[in-house]
């Protein structure tokens, strides 16, 4: 059994790696991720997953429902970290799987894969608490800069964390972005990670999030038509049923963190696409209390409130 396989087994038990192992893993991951496009090509069959947010034991439920990697080909739409108790183990397991099976798992960047955001919503504090220094946070946030911004399944399904941008009409414009940087406060790269579809908006609207935009059905229709895609698949917003279609099935939100923040009471979903792009949503609940680690039984920290 290789060192990497041992580390994967260890991470599957929700046991953190040594700092030196994290550093080496991140360096290996960087070599793989640097080769990926801003619009990374993904072949079907594939299973698409939304936000995880450090909910490690719920991600284990996800793998129970969807199958283990590499048997199942996975695409994760970002927001691996923050808010949950196990951001370190969650992100490192996904990263280790990426290094071990680079063609069977695709990771794209969410708005929480950012230095600034993780200093507010938990990942920075978790790294400090678990390692006694900021080094692991630094290695991981350096990797965030290398994550792709979007994916394209069989040239037909455009997958992104947040949504669209008024600065982007074509996929080639996304391909031209220099992604290897902290998420900017505005502009195309920011919008892809922060924007949301909104029923009551026609065209573009201001986002209450303070970053990105709200966009209406006409924007989606025109983007899908211009780029010859069937629909957009995105995450970024909690939906109580785990997934939600909008604008005559032109865009779907997939949310994969059940009972979000350990209190929202929502179910989660993943989207399974077969080789002909037929869809099946698999809905699942949070992991039962007895299968969780000791940490999750503690009261929620302040930033949930």
UniProtKB/Swiss-Prot annotation:
Its cofactor is Mn(2+). Its main location: plastid. It catalyses: O-phospho-L-seryl-[protein] + H2O = L-seryl-[protein] + phosphate; O-phospho-L-threonyl-[protein] + H2O = L-threonyl-[protein] + phosphate. The active site is at residue 112. SUPFAM superfamilies: Metallo-dependent phosphatases. Coiled coil: none annotated. Mn(2+) 2 binds at residues 79, 111, 161, 236. It is found in: Plastid stroma. One of its GO terms (biological process) is reciprocal meiotic recombination. Keywords: Hydrolase, Manganese, Metal-binding, Plastid, Protein phosphatase. Its EC number is 3.1.3.16. This is Serine/threonine-protein phosphatase PP-X isozyme 2. The lineage of its organism: Eukaryota, Viridiplantae, Streptophyta, Embryophyta, Tracheophyta. The gene is PPX2.
């Amino acid at each position: 059994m290789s060192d990497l396989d041992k580390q994967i087994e260890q991470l599957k038990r929700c046991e953190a790696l040594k700092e030196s192992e994290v550093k080496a893993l991140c360096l290996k991951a960087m070599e793989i991720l640097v080769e990926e496009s801003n619009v990374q090509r993904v072949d079907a069959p594939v299973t698409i997953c939304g936000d995880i947010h450090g909910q490690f034991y719920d991600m284990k439920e996800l793998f129970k429902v969807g199958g283990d990697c590499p048997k199942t080909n996975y695409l994760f739409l970002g927001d691996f970290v923050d808010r949950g108790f196990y951001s370190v183990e969650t992100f490192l397991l996904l990263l280790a799987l990426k290094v071990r099976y680079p063609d069977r798992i695709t990771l794209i960047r969410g708005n929480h894969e950012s230095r600034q955001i993780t200093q507010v919503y938990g990942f920075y504090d978790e790294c400090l608490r678990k390692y006694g220094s900021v080094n692991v946070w630094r290695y991981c946030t350096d990797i965030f800069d290398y994550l792709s911004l979007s994916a394209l399944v069989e040239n037909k399904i455009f997958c992104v964390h947040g949504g669209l941008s008024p600065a982007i009409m074509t996929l080639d414009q996304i391909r031209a972005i220099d992604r290897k940087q902290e998420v900017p406060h505005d502009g195309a790269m920011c919008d892809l990670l922060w924007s949301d579809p909104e029923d009551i908006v026609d065209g573009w609207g201001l986002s209450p999030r303070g970053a990105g935009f709200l966009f209406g059905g006409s924007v989606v229709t025109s983007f899908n038509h211009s780029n010859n895609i069937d629909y957009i698949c995105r995450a970024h917003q909690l939906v109580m049923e785990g997934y939600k279609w909008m604008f005559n099935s032109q865009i779907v939100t997939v949310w994969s963190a059940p009972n979000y923040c350990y209190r929202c009471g929502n179910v989660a979903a993943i989207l399974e696409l077969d080789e002909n792009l037929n869809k099946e949503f698999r809905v699942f609940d949070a992991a039962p209390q007895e299968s969780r680690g000791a940490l999750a039984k503690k009261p929620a920290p302040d930033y949930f409130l």
